[in-house]
């Protein structure tokens, strides 16, 4: 009744995981490396880290029977390119010495991985790196 367009989706879980994949691949890496989003896809090592983190999360989706709308790595890279000059919210949190949402992003991947018996070493490392930064505030 507010006159706003609305879309009802039976695919809420898919939409949440699609969004999570982008955050998994971009946020912690930009915060640790202290770089804008585009840097991640402009340099080989950071691009590989993005891929590894997202592929770990993708394995969890597959194990849970969640069919994503996009190839998550390509989608994440596309978002990084489209927002190349932007600094992620996690980067901004770290820059301002605020507690981040790491536990709800990469930490969620780690927790789901543990429940499902799926190793998530890259995401676990990213969580520990961000927590180490936060502990220094």
Question: Residue locations for each model-derived region?
Answer:
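Internal alpha-helical scaffold of NAD(P)-dependent oxidoreductase catalytic cores
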Residues: 1-22, 29-70, 74
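NAD(P)-dependent Rossmann-like dehydrogenase/reductase catalytic/cofactor-binding core
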Residues: 51-137
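Active-site/ligand-binding neighborhood in enzyme catalytic cores
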Residues: 25-36, 80, 102-105
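Alpha-helical structural signal
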Residues: 18, 22-25, 29, 87, ...
